[in-house]
Amino acid sequence: MPPNLTGYYRFVSQKNMEDYLQALNISLAVRKIALLLKPDKEIDHQGNHMMVRTLSTFRNYTVQFDVGVEFEEDLRSVDGRKCQTIVTWEEEQLVCVQKGEVPNRGWRHWLEGEMLYLELTARDAVCEQVFRKVR
């Protein structure tokens, strides 16, 4: 049975964010701002339905989905694109595949104790973020 990811998580660290943003063709000005951010994550996990909120001083983003059901994700507030998205469980990792203009785009979340890990991919770039559960 997959873990319940419900909780509020504070940013701890990240690696390779600039490479990831470049792979998405994000402008230099927005990349500079994004690299300064320390976003929090809020996850509400109720059965197969999930809401993931990314919260920062620059921009917030919320995505809601049912695990295993493909949907159109509006990423215009993130990078100006839309894509077809499906989120599934692979063992104890929540895995997202985003099909659209950018190849090999997606993410995966998993827990290790009180730490939430996020791996973001786009093209050949991989960004790793770590968050600590605070409630």
UniProtKB/Swiss-Prot annotation:
Q: What is its main location?
A: cytoplasm
Its subcellular locations are: Cytoplasm
Q: From which domain of life does this come?
A: Eukaryota
The UniProt GO MF terms for this protein read:
retinal binding; retinol binding
In Pfam terms, one family for this protein is: Lipocalin
InterPro entries per the record?
A: Calycin, Fatty_acid-bd, ILBP, Lipocln_cytosolic_FA-bd_dom
- State the GO CC annotations: cytoplasm
Q: Which keywords does the record carry?
A: Cytoplasm, Retinol-binding, Transport, Vitamin A
The reply on keyword Transmembrane is no
Give the function comment from the record. Answer: Intracellular transport of retinol.
Q: Which family does it belong to?
A: Belongs to the calycin superfamily. Fatty-acid binding protein (FABP) family.
PANTHER family (alphabetical): FATTY ACID BINDING PROTEIN
Please give the record's comment on domains: Forms a beta-barrel structure that accommodates hydrophobic ligands in its interior.
Task: Please identify the protein, giving its name as recorded.
Answer: Retinol-binding protein 5
Q: What lineage does the source organism belong to?
A: Eukaryota, Metazoa, Chordata, Craniata, Vertebrata
Provide the gene name from the record.
RBP5
